[in-house]
């Protein structure tokens, strides 16, 4: 049923799967469950559990408040989506998100806002488009970008050459078949120069913070683990490629802060030890 829905080429995978469920189970609420993006993601998690850890039992927890991507919670429960929080932050700063975040972390948000330690999305969009334009040299400049298929490299190049804003770029790329979220990831991968040489799975564990008494839990992990990226870089070729990609993304993010920061912040970041 799913193959039949995908064959017409007029819908994305999530919509095709929902239509297939409706065709197989008409008159049931199953298809309606797949209206929610997070429920589609849950299906993928359950498939992975069946394949990798069939003894594990997933426990579904209904989402309260706003759904994924909704502006604000439609009911009295004060839970906002991440998209809504970002928009509130951009228009009103830390105080605007105060009703929707834990009271204990609000001082940290206020401190970050005062210091300009947050993304300026206008700057980020222009920086991304500038990087993409700089890569428009030679034939099929985006052919090697990670995740490119079905001629998307040509569509991306045309969109980059014609667009003057990041929103225009995403509008030009997005179709029923190519959802905006996927095109946003594709454009960023292209801007940062990510190709299929990047490991498909994480080759290391970058330790950002922990409780000291819990560090012993890491002794049996199968991957290299460290808080120091340069130490991880020396582990093997896969780690070196991933560290380079991580630093590229970190430096891009630092430049696109409200108050831009210099390169190399990820190399200077010290591990955070939790005390509570």
Indicate residue ranges for each PLM-predicted region.
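Active-site cores that bind ATP or allylic diphosphates and position pyrophosphate for catalysis
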Residues: 1-276
């Amino acid at each position: 049923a799913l193959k039949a829905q995908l064959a017409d080429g007029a819908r994305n995978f999530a919509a095709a799967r929902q239509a297939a469920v409706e065709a197989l189970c008409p008159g049931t609420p199953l298809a309606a469950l797949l209206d929610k993006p997070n429920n589609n993601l849950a299906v993928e998690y359950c498939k992975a559990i069946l394949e990798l850890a069939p003894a594990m039992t997933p426990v579904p927890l209904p989402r309260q408040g706003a759904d994924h991507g909704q502006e604000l919670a439609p009911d009295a429960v004060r839970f906002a989506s991440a998209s809504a929080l970002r928009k509130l932050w951009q228009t009103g700063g830390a105080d605007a998100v105060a009703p929707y975040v834990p009271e204990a972390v609000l001082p940290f948000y206020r401190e970050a806002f005062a210091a300009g330690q947050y993304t300026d999305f206008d700057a980020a969009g222009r920086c991304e488009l500038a990087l993409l334009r700089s890569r428009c040299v030679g034939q099929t400049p985006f052919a090697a970008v990670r995740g490119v298929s079905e001629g998307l490299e040509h569509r991306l190049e045309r969109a980059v050459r014609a667009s003057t804003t990041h929103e225009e770029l995403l509008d030009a790329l997005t179709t029923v078949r190519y959802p905006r979220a996927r095109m946003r990831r594709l454009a960023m991968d292209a801007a940062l120069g990510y190709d299929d040489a990047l490991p498909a799975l994480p080759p290391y564990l970058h330790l950002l913070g922990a409780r000291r008494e819990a560090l012993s839990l890491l002794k049996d992990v199968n991957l290299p683990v460290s808080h120091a990226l340069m130490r991880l870089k020396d582990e093997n070729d896969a780690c070196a490629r991933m560290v380079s990609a991580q630093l590229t993304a970190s430096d891009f993010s630092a430049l696109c802060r409200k108050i831009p920061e210099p390169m190399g912040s990820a190399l200077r970041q010290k591990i955070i030890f939790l005390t509570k």
